[in-house]
Amino acid sequence: MKFTHLFFIGLLTKVYTETVTVLSTRSYRLATTESTPTDGTVYLTLTRQQSSSTSLNASTITTPPSNSSASVQTTAVTDCHFHNSVQYCVDGYGNEGSILPVPTNTNNLPTSYDGCHSHDGDTFCMDGDKEVQFVKLEDEDDEESSSSSGKKCHFHAGVEHCVDDNNHDAVTCERVKRDYDIPLRIGLLFVILVTSGIGSFGPIVLKQFVNLSQENYIIVIIKQFGTGIIISTAFVHLMTHAQLMWSNSCLKIKYEGTGASITMAGIFIAFIIEYIALRIVNARDTGKVDKKEIEETSSNEQSLHGISVNDKISVMILEAGIIFHSILIGITLVVTDDVYFITLFIVIVFHQFFEGLALSSRIISITNASLSTKLVMALMFALITPIGMAIGIGVLNKFNGNDPSTLIALGTLDSFSAGVLLWTGLIEMWSHDWLHGHLRNSSFVKTTVALVSLILGMLLMSLLGNWA
C-alpha cells in the first residue's frame, strides 16, 4: 500500500513538472513570469512571437485572482497599426482590438496608448489629454458604432442619437471629444456656397435672359417642384429634428407638446405679419384708387386668403423661415463626427440646391421688386449656410449637442422655422397655385406635369431625410 502511494505521488509530480506544448496557428507572446510580493501568486504575461508552436512550462501557469472592481489587467495597449484606415492595437493578454473614435488624420499617431482603465465593462486609454476606447474584436457588435460596443449611433441635426442592442436610448449628456478634419470642412464650405448659389440664382438668370412667362412649362415645373421641397422640408426635416431635440433624455421637459406649440407660434406669427402687411397695403391703396377698382384688382391679382403670392412681403416671410433653419444646417453639418460627415455633406449639397431652387422659383414671381432686390434675396440664401458652417468651425471644440441649452436653441429654431414654412408652403404656394391660381383651370397636360413636379419635390426631399 505504501508503495502504491509513493508511485502515484511520483506520477503526479512528473505530470506537474512536465513542459506543456501549445500548438496554434495564431501569433502568441513569449511567456514571462512575474510574482507579487503579497501572496506569491505567479502571473503569465505574453509578448508577441511569430511561431506555430510555443512551449509553456505548466508550473508557471496560474490563473490570476478575479477582481470584480476592474476588468482591465494591463495599463497599456501596444503594437498599434492600421488596416483600412482603422487603427488596431494589442492589449497585455494578446487580444487585438480597434481604437475608437476612428482617427481621421493618420500621421504621427502613437503606436501605443497608456493609462488604460475600465468604465462599465468598457476599456478606455489615454492619448495625451484625450480619451480613446479600446474594443476587442470579438466584442464589436456593429461596425457603425461610433461610441462604444453594443451601441448603434447616427447623427440627426448634429446631435448623436444612440441606442443599445435592446433599442433603448444610450445617451451621454457630457461632451464627447472628437478629432475633426478642419481643413476639409473649410474647403467644403465653399462647395456649399457654390451649390446654394446655383440653386438660388439659376431661375432668376434663366427668366431674365429667356423672359419666360409665369405659365410657361419650365416655370411651372420649377415652382411646383419647389413647393414640394418646402412642404417636405417643414414636415420631414424640421419637425422631425425638432421632435428629436425635445424628446432627448438630457432635456428634462415634461410638457410633450413643446415643439408643436412653437410650430403653431411660427404659423401664427407668419400669418399676423402677412395680415398686417395686407392692411397697410389696402389702407395705402384706398386713398389712391376707387374701392371698386381695388375689388376688381383683388379678384384678378390676389388670392382669396388676402395677399398676392407674388408680393415681396410673402416671399420675404418664406425666405426668413428658410434662413432660420439654413444657418442651423451649416452649424450642425460641421459639428458632425468625421465618420458621418462626408455622407451628410453630400445630402446637404442636394438639400441646399433644391431649397435654393424652391426659394428662387418664388423670387422670380415677385412683381413689385427690382432685379437688384431679387439678386440680394438670392445672395442671402447662398451665404447663410456657409456662415453657419463658419460659426460651427468656431465652436467646434466646445459644441455639445446633448447640452440642454443647445437642445433648447436647436429645437426652438427648428420648430419655429417649421411653422413659418408650413404657412408659406401650404397657404402661399400650394393653395394659391392650385385653388386660386392659373392651375385651377389649366389643361390636363399642364395639370399632370405640375402634379408630378409637386410629388417629385416631396419625394426627393423626404428621401434626403433618411440621412439628414
UniProtKB/Swiss-Prot annotation:
Residues 207-217, 279-314, 360-374, 428-447 are cytoplasmic. Induction: Expression is RIM101-dependent and up-regulated in alkaline conditions. The promoter contains 2 RIM101 binding sites 5'-GCCAAG-3'. Expression is induced by macrophages during oralpharyngeal candidasis infection. Expression is also increased during hyphal transition, biofilm formation and surface adherence. Residues 18-185, 239-257, 336-338, 396-406 are extracellular. The chain crosses the membrane at residues 186-206, 218-238, 258-278, 315-335, 339-359, 375-395, 407-427, 448-468. The keyword Cell inner membrane does not apply. It is found in: Cell membrane. One of its GO terms (molecular function) is zinc ion binding. Keywords: Cell membrane, Glycoprotein, Ion transport, Membrane, Signal, Transmembrane, Transmembrane helix, Transport, Zinc, Zinc transport. The gene is ZRT101. Zinc transporter that acts with PRA1 in sequestration of zinc from host tissues during infection. The pH-regulated antigen 1 (PRA1) binds zinc from its environment and then reassociates with ZRT1 to acquire this essential metal. It is a multi-pass membrane protein. Glycans are attached at residues 57, 67. This is Zinc-regulated transporter 1. InterPro entries: ZIP (IPR003689). Disruption phenotype: Leads to poor growth in the absence of exogenous zinc and impairs assimilation of zinc from host cells. It catalyses: Zn(2+)(in) = Zn(2+)(out). One of its GO terms (biological process) is zinc ion transmembrane transport. Residues 1-17 form the signal peptide. Belongs to the ZIP transporter (TC 2.A.5) family. GO terms for cellular component: plasma membrane. The keyword DNA damage does not apply. It comes from the Eukaryota.
